[in-house]
Amino acid sequence: VIGKVGKEHIPIPFNFSSIETMFSSKEANIIKSHLLEEHGNEVKVPILNLMKSKNRFVKELADYVYTNIFFNYTKKMWDLEPQELDPAVLSRVPIQIGYDDRYFHDKYQSMPKYGYTKMFQKILDHPNIEVKLRTHFKDISNPEEFKKIIYTGPIDEYFDYRHGELPYRSIRFEFFTENKEYTQKVATINYPGFEYKHTRVTEFKHMTFQ
């Protein structure tokens, strides 16, 4: 994943490669040395933690990243400013102290050979699975027959809105096809700036190796 920040394309999560792209070599080396001194190497630090740093270089970097990436992207995604959200939301994409630009660090990572649609079709085709369409959760007449029921609907609706309605925000997906091998160099490009109406563009070929 990379982000379009101004005229530059920088790796996200924000890491040492991002710093080297956005700052001069001298500035980047100073910033990296202070980050390493304060936090160590190959660790992930939430942006809000960096913003509380007493180190001038670390604090200035954190403010820069917050203003140019986190604030705009959060406002576009949720229509709320970061301080209006639970801190855990911003902690999902921490700053990486080092050059690792991966979102996930699991030892084993994979994708279904024939895609998720085919995988779920085969799962639901099992003789022990009954699929009921257009059926409301509360209209199931025999829930006691099942050891476990997994509810995936709105959680406030499940509790009959006894605590009110939650402020959900929807996402609009737009799909388009271009007659070329690839349209971008990586799978996903994020667009945090307000000059773009969209938040990201994903080219799935990079992930499925079509």
Question: Which residue ranges define each predicted feature?
Answer:
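N-terminal glycine-rich phosphate/pyrophosphate-binding loop and immediately adjacent elements
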Residues: 1-24
